[in-house]
Amino acid sequence: MGTVYFTRAVLPEMIKNHYGKIINVASVAGVYGNANMVHYSATKGAVISMTKALAKEVSAQGICVNSVSPGSVSPAENRDMDYFEDSQLSFMGRTGTANENANLICFLASEEANYISGQNIQIDGCRKKQ
């Protein structure tokens, strides 16, 4: 619900200014669904659906709404250590990094991404569908 509450809080000012960027963080679990993670998968899927629906409502007012769905990410404290099991989920053979996710979010927040809205962008190293 935090995504909904935060959006409600910032949207009026964005509408008033005819400009804004909303970038939600979902997960590949919301795209594919993960076994034994039904609640997590469902809520992340809801974030993706909310992103697409809200973009249709506010894009004409200069507001871009997108979501990012990371795959497996190695913790910063283990930057040099890749988790073998998680790395097997990607055709790239490794997990992602926090910086790779942050770079995508920074791009979506930039003016270079002013024509991108209503998208869920997976950053998952070409994840193998389960």
Predicted segments with their positions:
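A glycine/serine/threonine-rich, flexible loop-to-helix segment
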Residues: 60, 67-90, 130
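Active-site loop-to-helix junction immediately N-terminal to the catalytic Tyr of the SDR YXXXK motif
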Residues: 33-41, 53
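A conserved structural motif in NAD(P)-dependent oxidoreductases
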Residues: 90-101, 112
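Residue(s) in the substrate-gating loop at a strand-loop-helix junction
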Residues: 27
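Alpha-helical segment proximal to the catalytic Tyr-Lys
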Residues: 12, 56-60, 114
